[in-house]
């Protein structure tokens, strides 16, 4: 489970398609977090770092880029909570055609898609930053959804992170460390732009939230939980963690 808490849901799209996104909730887990001593959560946690035929990196590294779509293995109630069991990106918006990106984790409830550079979908003139092409992201988020990411922290200390995201109407997220709230509510600024004539593209205006979170992290393996708190309608690609100054 997450390490327990709350959140919203995002909308992603494709020509004439407005979708929603999934990723974080307040929910208790099969984990024991009573004293939150270092290692206690990780020892009891039933999820495992993501891996597949292409990604064999194990726990995601901090400092470094932490990919949201590489949330942990373990399923609903352990590695994530989503408002429904259907992946509205992989296998639905992105048809199941046998390709890696279109079918990425399509049997899981977290809604996932990837950036597309045709028809000015994700390489559009309304971006505040240009995202990488074929960048996987968690989308269709709704309040109450969450997902866990196991990370390997090189050295104990304070870290800040930038977030690559889109948000049709703003909202808030939060981040837990080993089952305890570590961030409080974090404001996501809306990327809505009324001058874009294409309605569905409001879910594809990319931006970076600089230093959106500051965490004190112990060295070694830790579990981060991303919660969607309010609004949803966000696409969350990755957090870039660096040592705080």
Residue ranges and their predicted role:
Residues 10-13, 29:
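Serine residues within intrinsically disordered or low-complexity segments
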Residues 1, 24-28, 72:
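Generic low-polarity alpha-helical segments
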Residues 1-11:
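N-terminal secretory signal peptides that target proteins for export/translocation
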